[in-house]
């Protein structure tokens, strides 16, 4: 709702049974509203990356909603895991915020090229085809790249030769949030409860504050989910 068809602010909605998933959780309503689809996408990507506690992980587009959700999910289970994020340009204010959220280091991404020679065991690629070839150059041997996002505004990867581009015996996978199933949703909420994952939204607005909520989202000043609460 809100994308394929309107009605995401409705007090009551009529949905197909196939889009209704029962869950068991201790989260509040505001916290629960902050989970889908962002944490579902991050959780599926995390599973496909097969994270190990000894890994060094890169998140391209570290300030994105999925990037921050991924950070919180993996750090909740592996607090000492080294997670590095990339952001466009050298933004000291954004870097400070992201380090405060839990990233271990932030790397500048200049025109989809990382300003580092460091390589990583796992890479969550949220920029997409615009930067993925550069990610190929930063993956360790037998590492895994999960191509999940398309934030770079490029939808397809031209001239891709798996034999030549994946030089380090690396693995390339993906996760599509549209492939929703009840089992994975149950796993996600069980994981959040078991590891006490912080999923609280960054801001909560009342329905009467809907204009301010949209102004805040469109300002790109936030670093997390914004929830509109109907009393």
Describe these PLM feature segments.
Residues 1-21, 49:
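Glycine-rich phosphate/adenylate-binding loop and adjacent beta-alpha elements
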Residues 4, 130-194, 230-231:
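Glycine-rich phosphate-binding loop and adjacent beta-alpha segment
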Residues 8-9, 89-97, 156-161:
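Short, glycine/polar-rich helix-capping loops at beta-to-alpha or helix-loop-helix junctions
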Residues 32-111:
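Mid-domain Rossmann-like dinucleotide-binding core that forms the NAD(H)/NADP(H) cofactor-binding site
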Residues 44, 180-231:
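C-terminal hydrophobic helical "lid"/dimerization subdomain
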Residues 52, 78, 140, 167, ...:
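Short conserved AdoMet
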Residues 114-123:
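A short acidic, Gly/Pro-enriched loop at the edge of an enzyme's catalytic core
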Residues 123-124, 146:
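N-terminal Rossmann-like NAD(P) cofactor-binding module of classical short-chain dehydrogenase/reductase
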């Amino acid at each position: 709702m809100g994308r394929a068809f309107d009605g995401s602010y409705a007090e009551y909605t009529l949905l197909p049974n196939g889009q209704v998933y029962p869950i068991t959780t201790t989260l509040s309503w505001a916290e629960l509203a902050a989970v889908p689809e962002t944490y579902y996408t991050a959780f599926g990507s995390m599973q496909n990356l097969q994270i190990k506690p000894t890994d060094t992980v890169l998140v391209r587009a570290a300030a994105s909603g999925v990037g921050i959700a991924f950070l919180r999910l993996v750090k909740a289970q592996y607090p000492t895991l080294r997670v590095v994020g990339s952001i466009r340009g050298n933004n000291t204010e954004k870097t400070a915020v992201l380090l405060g959220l839990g990233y271990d280091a932030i790397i500048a991404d200049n025109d989809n090229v990382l300003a580092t020679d460091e390589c990583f065991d796992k890479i969550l690629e949220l920029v997409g085809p615009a930067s993925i070839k550069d990610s190929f150059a930063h993956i360790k041997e037998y590492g895994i790249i999960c191509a999940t996002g398309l934030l770079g505004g490029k939808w397809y990867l031209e001239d891709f030769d798996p034999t030549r581009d994946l030089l380090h015996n690396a693995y390339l996978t993906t996760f599509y949030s549209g492939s929703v199933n009840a089992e994975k949703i149950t796993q996600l909420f069980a994981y959040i409860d078991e590891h006490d994952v912080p999923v609280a939204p960054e801001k909560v607005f009342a329905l009467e504050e809907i204009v301010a909520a949209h102004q805040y989202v469109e300002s790109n000043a936030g670093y997390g989910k914004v929830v509109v609460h109907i009393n």
